[in-house]
Amino acid sequence: MKILVTGTSGLIGYNLVERLLKDGHEVFGTIHKNNKRVKGVEYFYGDLRDMEFCKEITEGMDVVVNCSANTSNAVDTVKSPLVHVTPNVIVNTQLIEASYFSGVAQYVFISSSTVYPPSGDKLVDETWNIFEEPYPVYHAVGWMKRYGEVLCDLYSNQLSPSMDCIVVRPGNCYGPHDKWDFDKCHVTPATI
């Protein structure tokens, strides 16, 4: 299977391409800086905010996994909550559109647990109301990720022909290939 993974220098993307290669898939990745690379991945160098680049890289792919995200650290999310909204909305919108018009069979969107509202003492399941406000600290990021999920619903349930879309909402991930520098890392690595 030909699989494109965006965000291959990040924690989830890097580990995912390693696994996909191990499973025998033909793996392609995107890179926008001189970031770390995985041997065996064919890389496209460019900017996912460029629609022509998105069209070029999705052409001929069976699956596109969007692990890319304009991120920094938890402190930035609190101090400058809008810093990541516009770049991520542009990338998410263009990548799913390019995937659809390129005939990609399956699109996987890596969302975030920031979409959930505060739950207090109750457990949250899939029946929660998506229009409840996200946790206040992650309000901007939560709504931005929710918009990506709404796009997935549009392309998989509202259009004909449709494109199979999967939404994954990881929690506070950490592990090999994560950012461990306190000034750049997310909450979990910062506490370790």
Task: List the model feature ranges, each with a label.
Residues 35, 45-88, 101:
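NAD(P)H-binding glycine-rich loop region in Rossmannoid oxidoreductase-like domains
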Residues 74-82, 118-123, 177-180:
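Conserved catalytic-core motifs of eukaryotic protein kinase domains, centered on the activation segment
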Residues 115-117, 139-140, 163-188:
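Flexible, glycine-rich beta-alpha linker
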Residues 66, 93-138, 158, 163-166:
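Conserved Rossmann-fold NAD(P)-dependent oxidoreductase catalytic core, especially the SDR/UDP-sugar
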Residues 3-23:
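N-terminal Rossmann NAD(P)H-binding glycine-rich loop of SDR-like oxidoreductase domains
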Residues 136-169, 192:
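Active-site Tyr-X1-5-Lys
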Residues 84-92, 108-111, 144-145:
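Short alpha-helix in the Rossmann-fold core of NAD(P)-dependent oxidoreductases
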Residues 25-32:
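Conserved glycine-rich Rossmann-like NAD(P)H-binding loop of the short-chain dehydrogenase/reductase
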